[in-house]
Amino acid sequence: MPDKFKRVHVIVMDSVGIGEAPDAAKFGDFDVDTFGHIAKHVGGLKMPEMGKLGLSNIREIEGIEKAEKPLAYYTKMQEASNGKDTMTGHWEIMGLYIDTPFRVFPDGFPDDLINQIEAKTGRKVIGNKPASGTEIMAELGEEHVKTGALIVYTSADSVLQIAAHEDVVPLEELYEICEFCREITLDDPYMLGRIIARPFVGEPGAFVRTPNRHDYALKPFKPTVMDALKDGGKDVIAIGKISDIFDGEGVTESIRTKSNMDGMDQFIDVLDKDFNGMSFLNLVDFDALFGHRRDPQGYADALVDFDGRLVEVMEKLTDDDLLIITADHGNDPTYTGTDHTREFVPLLVYSPRFKNGGSELELRQTFADLGATVADNFDVKMPEYGKSFLKDLK
């Protein structure tokens, strides 16, 4: 590939794994396959655009034809880090290796942490267990409205979430509480990946979350490829929750989104901008609305909707653009429980410059190969981990 690309666009389909990783059993996962099991559940997925790129060339997905001449280079990536959460996946994509997993609290948080929150805020804590946000809001929302107590809960991820009605706990107060929780959980014994403010509105029986969610992540422990790009004078446009995942590090512009389709709208708007660097989009609905809630039909519909938007994306790309579509972990909605699943993730790499289409790339042993390729393209500092496949794109 003689000329470098002016713009690289990375789309992370949050949780869209493509089959069980070799070490899945170590993570308690057996026979997991997000893409495959969704397709089977609905009797085949209709995703012609992803099909043309070469999705079923990676491995066959029911309903999606294998492309005779795939438009994209294709393979799958294996996660090297010791985790299967959003932060671990994204940080590895951008060149980090996470050896010590973020802590999870399947039985709720220790009394010491809860006592600190109550002492600081003057509010009681209710909940303190793993739960779906919508379910715990329905279960404890009325008590919260009556008493002003904070609904604190966790999930299978390394996360502490605080739900509060906007008329009971004003947004600024909720954000301040979450900032305090962030400060006291940065290190052992808690070492939480994220604190999330989960505001809601409405009446008992009809509570609904607002778009004013805010994530407080850990800062990456080392510079990522995003930092290298920013330091090298390149643009890093973070769309969706990307800026939250990296706690703003290495980001030159952040664009919030309200849904997958809003994310695609924002991304398509970014394609109209003249910039030199990377756009980085996370589509969280796959994970948050359908994976954790074990809703394979909803997940399938969201995949089909995403595929439909790729037509607009492809129309806007030029020979100066490189599009990379991948995921950060699995979340098989047909599997037991509500946790993420340890899986390979798809990798599709496309540019209109590939006049003869794409072909199979070698299996990537770490997500960091993606970040290394981006760094290689822009001639910035290479990450410690990862092997660029830029030279394989012809």
Swiss-Prot record:
Residues annotated to bind Mn(2+) 2: 287, 292, 340
Keyword Metal-binding: yes
Family annotation (SUPFAM superfamilies): Alkaline phosphatase-like, DeoB insert domain-like
Location of this chain's protein in the cell: Cytoplasm
Entries under CDD domains matching the protein: PPM
Note on how the cofactor is bound: Binds 2 manganese ions.
EC numbers for this chain: 5.4.2.7
Reactions catalysed, as given in the entry: 2-deoxy-alpha-D-ribose 1-phosphate = 2-deoxy-D-ribose 5-phosphate; alpha-D-ribose 1-phosphate = D-ribose 5-phosphate
Domain of life: Bacteria
Record pathway: Carbohydrate degradation; 2-deoxy-D-ribose 1-phosphate degradation; D-glyceraldehyde 3-phosphate and acetaldehyde from 2-deoxy-alpha-D-ribose 1-phosphate: step 1/2
UniProt main location, coarse: cytoplasm
InterPro entries: Alkaline_phosphatase_core_sf (IPR017850), DeoB (IPR010045), Metalloenzyme (IPR006124), Phosphopentomutase_DeoB_cap_sf (IPR024052)
Gene Ontology terms describing biological process: 2-deoxyribose 1-phosphate catabolic process; 5-phosphoribose 1-diphosphate biosynthetic process; metabolic compound salvage; nucleotide metabolic process
GO molecular function list: magnesium ion binding; manganese ion binding; phosphopentomutase activity
Keywords of this entry: Cytoplasm, Isomerase, Manganese, Metal-binding
Cofactor: Mn(2+)
Chain positions recorded as Mn(2+) 1 binding sites: 14, 328-329
GO CC, one annotated term: cytosol
HAMAP family in the record: Phosphopentomut
UniProt function note: Isomerase that catalyzes the conversion of deoxy-ribose 1-phosphate (dRib-1-P) and ribose 1-phosphate (Rib-1-P) to deoxy-ribose 5-phosphate (dRib-5-P) and ribose 5-phosphate (Rib-5-P), respectively.
Family under the similarity heading: Belongs to the phosphopentomutase family.
Protein's name according to its UniProt entry: Phosphopentomutase
Organism name: Listeria innocua serovar 6a (strain ATCC BAA-680 / CLIP 11262)
